Amino acid sequence: MNQFLFVSFCALLGLSQVSAATLSSGRIVGGFQIDIAEVPHQVSLQRSGRHFCGGSIISPRWVLTAAHCTTNTDPAAYTIRAGSTDRTNGGIIVKVKSVIPHPQYNGDTYNYDFSLLELDESIGFSRSIEAIALPEASETVADGAMCTVSGWGDTKNVFEMNTLLRAVNVPSYNQAECAAALVNVVPVTEQMICAGYAAGGKDSCQGDSGGPLVSGDKLVGVVSWGKGCALPNLPGVYARVSTVRQWIREVSEV
């Protein structure tokens, strides 16, 4: 990626971001094609029928994505596609009833890059549609723990969307080292978690923003931002879900 925002799912993909000043949005780089049944919590967030961000099902009525994906808070602007490996067809399309960005979200620094989407109707769960568990506030991700990120974003750092879902496995990155690597971009805060390889080569990229970063069986991050895609010594940055667990519970009762 050049520079991007993303939400991630620690084990499958990498990082993704949305264009803004020096940041860009992303797609999976160095990953592999994956079936939706392997990541049934993954959804495509769409505008006018076109994919632009990812998201994660956390209950039959709620999806968690990145706040930078929902700067327009009019729910009529969005739908989600769930249950399909193909972002252009299959699965189900569900309207969004309300868009609730985190009240402390900062669009300049991407701090608290979370947004809850209340769906217009409850969705039924199946092999290809399922909620993912959330970490509690006290839970942490150890340095080097493998995570999976998934999405339909750019695979070649050229902002060209994938039609079929992809994922990448990346290790969590030491927080202090991540902050030092990105010190000239934006501050890496406690509300963020980093993942990637020092050598680069695997990451999320344009179009993956808002998607899941999964460690074990829990959603530990949301693809938020990064400096380029899959570049050496520049890990991807995700919004750390455990830090807003109470807010998610208060808003969604999940």
From Swiss-Prot:
Tissue localization of expression: Midgut.
Gene Ontology MF terms in the entry: serine-type endopeptidase activity
Xref: PANTHER family: GH13245P2-RELATED, POLYSERASE-RELATED
Listed GO CC annotations: extracellular region
Propeptide residue intervals: 21-27
GO biological process: digestion; proteolysis
Database matches in InterPro entries: Peptidase_S1 (IPR050430), Peptidase_S1_PA (IPR009003), Peptidase_S1_PA_chymotrypsin (IPR043504), Peptidase_S1A (IPR001314), Trypsin_dom (IPR001254), TRYPSIN_HIS (IPR018114), TRYPSIN_SER (IPR033116)
Protein purpose: Major function may be to aid in digestion of the blood meal.
Induction notes from the record: By blood feed.
Name of the protein in its database record: Trypsin 3A1
Source organism: Aedes aegypti (Yellowfever mosquito)
Family: Belongs to the peptidase S1 family.
Site (Required for specificity) location in chain: D203
Catalytic activity line of the entry: Preferential cleavage: Arg-|-Xaa, Lys-|-Xaa
EC id: 3.4.21.4
The organism's place on the tree of life at top rank: Eukaryota
Keywords from the named record: Digestion, Disulfide bond, Hydrolase, Protease, Secreted, Serine protease, Signal, Zymogen
Top class in the EC scheme: hydrolase
Active site: H68, D113, S209
